[in-house]
């Protein structure tokens, strides 16, 4: 089982990366929180990896921190939640909010995460509430810091909208959120910053 990958980052998107390790390119699914922490393409990168075996393939899911990997493992322990939905959840809400929502029975906050219906959100709280009670989120979860340069504005806006749609938000809702962020001073900001602000808007 692959638990960690270290190598050259040869491709990155908001949902996956390809890492070259000794001439072999590994495609790794990632949540947005990991995307925010990635270095530039061509740089060395190391990710903690969860290996998911399917009938005809292997799915690798990568994280910048071991703590986030453990949170991912908690999510997929919930009946009905697979790796893709778990990644989607970790992309739609930061680790601190997720732990707080589960520990405090905040169903309304979980319902704002795309892909989590009422029954699934209730199941997450029911099955994980006791398990996260010992987590001190501010101390144990590594948070994201924006370190990326701004990119072309129009391309950035399109990429941001596309990323939100891929997370499960409706096209118009994604566009409205991005437009609001831009109108409130988001011009010339990096994709990372725009996405984080847009997710906060969508969570309101």
Curated annotation (Swiss-Prot):
SUPFAM superfamilies: DNA helicase RuvA subunit, C-terminal domain (SSF46929), Nucleic acid-binding proteins (SSF50249), RuvA domain 2-like (SSF47781)
InterPro entries: DNA_helicase_Holl-junc_RuvA_I, Hlx-hairpin-Hlx_DNA-bd_motif, NA-bd_OB-fold, RuvA, RuvA_2-like, RuvA_C, RuvA_C_sf
Pfam family membership, one: RuvA_N
Source taxon at top rank: Bacteria
Subcellular location: Cytoplasm
Gene Ontology CC terms, in alphabetical order: cytoplasm; Holliday junction helicase complex; Holliday junction resolvase complex
Protein's UniProt keywords contain DNA repair: yes
Region of interest (Domain III), residue spans: 154-204
A single MF term (Gene Ontology): ATP binding
Keywords annotated in UniProt: Cytoplasm, DNA damage, DNA recombination, DNA repair, DNA-binding
GO biological process terms held by the UniProt record: DNA recombination; DNA repair
Similarity section: Belongs to the RuvA family.
Purpose: The RuvA-RuvB-RuvC complex processes Holliday junction (HJ) DNA during genetic recombination and DNA repair, while the RuvA-RuvB complex plays an important role in the rescue of blocked DNA replication forks via replication fork reversal (RFR). RuvA specifically binds to HJ cruciform DNA, conferring on it an open structure. The RuvB hexamer acts as an ATP-dependent pump, pulling dsDNA into and through the RuvAB complex. HJ branch migration allows RuvC to scan DNA until it finds its consensus sequence, where it cleaves and resolves the cruciform DNA.
Domain remark text: Has three domains with a flexible linker between the domains II and III and assumes an 'L' shape. Domain III is highly mobile and contacts RuvB.
Protein name: Holliday junction branch migration complex subunit RuvA
Organism expressing this protein natively: Syntrophus aciditrophicus (strain SB)
Lineage: Bacteria, Pseudomonadati, Thermodesulfobacteriota, Syntrophia, Syntrophales
């Amino acid at each position: 089982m692959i638990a960690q990958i270290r190598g050259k980052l040869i491709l990155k998107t908001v949902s996956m990366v390809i890492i070259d390790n000794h001439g072999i390119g590994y495609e790794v699914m990632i949540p947005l929180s990991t995307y925010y922490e990635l270095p530039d393409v061509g740089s060395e990168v190391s990710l903690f990896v969860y290996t998911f075996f399917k009938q005809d393939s292997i799915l690798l899911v990568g994280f910048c921190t071991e703590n986030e990997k453990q949170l991912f493992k908690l999510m997929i322990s919930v009946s009905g939640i697979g790796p893709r939905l778990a990644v989607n959840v970790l992309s739609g809400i930061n680790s601190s909010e997720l732990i707080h929502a589960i520990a405090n029975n905040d169903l309304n906050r979980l319902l704002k995460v795309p892909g989590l219906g009422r029954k699934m959100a209730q199941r997450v709280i029911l099955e994980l509430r006791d398990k996260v009670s010992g987590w001190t989120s501010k101390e144990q979860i590594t948070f994201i810091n924006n370190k990326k340069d701004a990119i072309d504005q129009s391309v950035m806006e399109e990429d941001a909208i596309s990323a939100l749609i891929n997370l499960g938000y409706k096209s118009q809702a994604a566009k409205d959120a991005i437009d609001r962020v831009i109108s409130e001073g988001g011009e010339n900001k990096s994709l990372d910053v725009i996405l984080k602000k847009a997710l906060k808007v969508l969570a309101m």
